[in-house]
């Protein structure tokens, strides 16, 4: 089976927001584009964070923050895993599985966002990547490891 580069599998049309964008506007962009996350980039388009639907729910809505005045920099995930478009998809799959992350910003050598790789992208290309590899990756991403906290 041919080795596939991340650039062949990733989504290339990526929306992004700046750290000072308010949470409400970021959520609207995500909703309008049917996406579950959005990279947060500085003026040079370098990734400084990622905002997920989960971040909005747990760090803004559940904390009763005013979304129209709360900048995404206050609720975004700052420890962002990224991958390079020239690397093999298997490298990104390992990163996603080991860290249980569903979406990975794809950045060039200058850390500028050029795409995003999602579980959906992997599923769309499963025949080229290897169906069993994709299934294993998704299973590992979704497998809850460790103890869970009872919120009730």
Per-segment meaning from a language model:
Residues 1-13, 52-97, 119-152:
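Tandem CBS (Bateman) regulatory domains
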Residues 3-11, 21-26, 40-47, 115, ...:
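Short charge-dense sequence patches
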Residues 16-34, 41, 83-100, 107, ...:
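The conserved cystathionine-beta-synthase
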Residues 30-33, 38-54, 96, 104-120:
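A glycine-centered beta-loop-beta connector
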Residues 34, 65-66, 101, 112, ...:
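A signal for specific C-terminal beta-sheet/loop modules enriched in small/flexible residues
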């Amino acid at each position: 089976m041919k080795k596939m580069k991340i650039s062949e599998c990733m989504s290339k049309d990526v929306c992004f927001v700046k750290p000072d964008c308010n949470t409400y506007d970021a959520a609207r962009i995500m909703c309008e584009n049917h996406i579950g996350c959005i990279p947060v980039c500085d003026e040079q388009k370098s990734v400084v964070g990622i905002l997920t639907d989960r971040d909005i729910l747990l760090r803004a809505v559940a904390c009763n923050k005013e979304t129209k005045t709360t900048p995404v920099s206050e609720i975004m995930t700052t420890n962002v895993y990224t991958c390079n478009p020239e690397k093999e998809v298997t490298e990104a799959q390992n990163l996603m599985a080991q860290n249980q992350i569903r979406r990975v910003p794809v950045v060039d050598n200058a850390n500028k966002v050029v795409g995003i790789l999602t579980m959906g992208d992997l599923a769309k290309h499963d025949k080229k990547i290897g169906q069993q590899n994709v299934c294993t990756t998704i299973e590992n991403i979704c497998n809850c490891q460790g103890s869970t906290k009872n919120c009730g």
